[in-house]
Amino acid sequence: MPKKNEAPASFEKALSELEQIVTRLESGDLPLEEALNEFERGVQLARQGQDKLQQAEQRVQILLSDNEDASLTPFTPDNE
Protein backbone atom coordinates (compact mmCIF):
# COMPACT_ATOMS: atom_id res chain seq x y z
CA MET A 1 0.00 0.00 0.00
CA PRO A 2 1.36 3.49 -0.80
CA LYS A 3 2.47 5.68 2.06
CA LYS A 4 -0.13 7.93 3.64
CA ASN A 5 0.41 11.07 1.54
CA GLU A 6 1.72 9.35 -1.57
CA ALA A 7 -0.44 9.75 -4.66
CA PRO A 8 -1.18 6.55 -6.61
CA ALA A 9 0.31 6.31 -10.09
CA SER A 10 -3.04 6.49 -11.86
CA PHE A 11 -6.70 7.27 -11.39
CA GLU A 12 -7.50 3.58 -11.75
CA LYS A 13 -5.04 2.57 -9.01
CA ALA A 14 -6.42 5.26 -6.71
CA LEU A 15 -9.95 4.02 -7.33
CA SER A 16 -8.92 0.43 -6.67
CA GLU A 17 -7.21 1.40 -3.41
CA LEU A 18 -10.26 3.42 -2.38
CA GLU A 19 -12.54 0.43 -3.05
CA GLN A 20 -10.28 -1.77 -0.89
CA ILE A 21 -10.41 0.78 1.93
CA VAL A 22 -14.21 0.92 1.75
CA THR A 23 -14.36 -2.88 1.95
CA ARG A 24 -12.11 -2.94 5.01
CA LEU A 25 -14.08 -0.18 6.71
CA GLU A 26 -17.42 -1.83 5.96
CA SER A 27 -16.21 -5.10 7.48
CA GLY A 28 -16.22 -3.46 10.90
CA ASP A 29 -13.19 -5.54 11.95
CA LEU A 30 -10.65 -2.71 12.16
CA PRO A 31 -9.57 -1.19 15.46
CA LEU A 32 -10.65 2.42 15.85
CA GLU A 33 -7.24 4.01 15.20
CA GLU A 34 -6.67 1.91 12.09
CA ALA A 35 -10.19 2.67 10.85
CA LEU A 36 -9.55 6.39 11.28
CA ASN A 37 -6.28 6.11 9.35
CA GLU A 38 -8.02 4.20 6.57
CA PHE A 39 -10.83 6.75 6.47
CA GLU A 40 -8.30 9.58 6.24
CA ARG A 41 -6.52 7.85 3.36
CA GLY A 42 -9.87 7.23 1.65
CA VAL A 43 -10.81 10.90 1.84
CA GLN A 44 -7.41 11.81 0.42
CA LEU A 45 -7.82 9.35 -2.46
CA ALA A 46 -11.35 10.58 -3.18
CA ARG A 47 -10.11 14.17 -3.39
CA GLN A 48 -7.21 13.19 -5.64
CA GLY A 49 -9.60 11.26 -7.88
CA GLN A 50 -11.97 14.22 -8.07
CA ASP A 51 -9.06 16.48 -9.03
CA LYS A 52 -8.00 14.08 -11.78
CA LEU A 53 -11.55 13.92 -13.12
CA GLN A 54 -11.82 17.71 -13.16
CA GLN A 55 -8.49 17.96 -15.00
CA ALA A 56 -9.69 15.44 -17.57
CA GLU A 57 -12.94 17.36 -18.04
CA GLN A 58 -11.00 20.59 -18.57
CA ARG A 59 -8.77 18.91 -21.16
CA VAL A 60 -11.83 17.66 -23.05
CA GLN A 61 -13.36 21.14 -22.98
CA ILE A 62 -10.12 22.66 -24.29
CA LEU A 63 -9.92 20.09 -27.07
CA LEU A 64 -13.52 20.69 -28.06
CA SER A 65 -13.15 24.46 -27.91
CA ASP A 66 -10.40 24.22 -30.54
CA ASN A 67 -13.03 22.87 -32.91
CA GLU A 68 -15.43 25.72 -33.65
CA ASP A 69 -18.14 23.35 -34.89
CA ALA A 70 -18.14 21.22 -31.73
CA SER A 71 -20.55 22.14 -28.97
CA LEU A 72 -20.29 21.18 -25.31
CA THR A 73 -23.28 19.45 -23.80
CA PRO A 74 -23.49 18.20 -20.23
CA PHE A 75 -23.06 14.46 -19.89
CA THR A 76 -26.04 12.52 -18.65
CA PRO A 77 -26.13 8.71 -18.69
CA ASP A 78 -29.63 8.78 -20.22
CA ASN A 79 -28.35 10.38 -23.47
CA GLU A 80 -27.38 7.56 -25.81
Curated annotation (Swiss-Prot):
Major site of localization recorded for this protein: cytoplasm
Coiled coil: none
InterPro entries: Exonuc_VII_S, Exonuc_VII_ssu_sf
GO molecular function, one term: exodeoxyribonuclease VII activity
Quaternary structure and interacting proteins, as annotated: Heterooligomer composed of large and small subunits.
Family membership noted in the UniProt record: Belongs to the XseB family.
Name used for this protein in its record: Exodeoxyribonuclease 7 small subunit
Origin species: Escherichia coli (strain SE11)
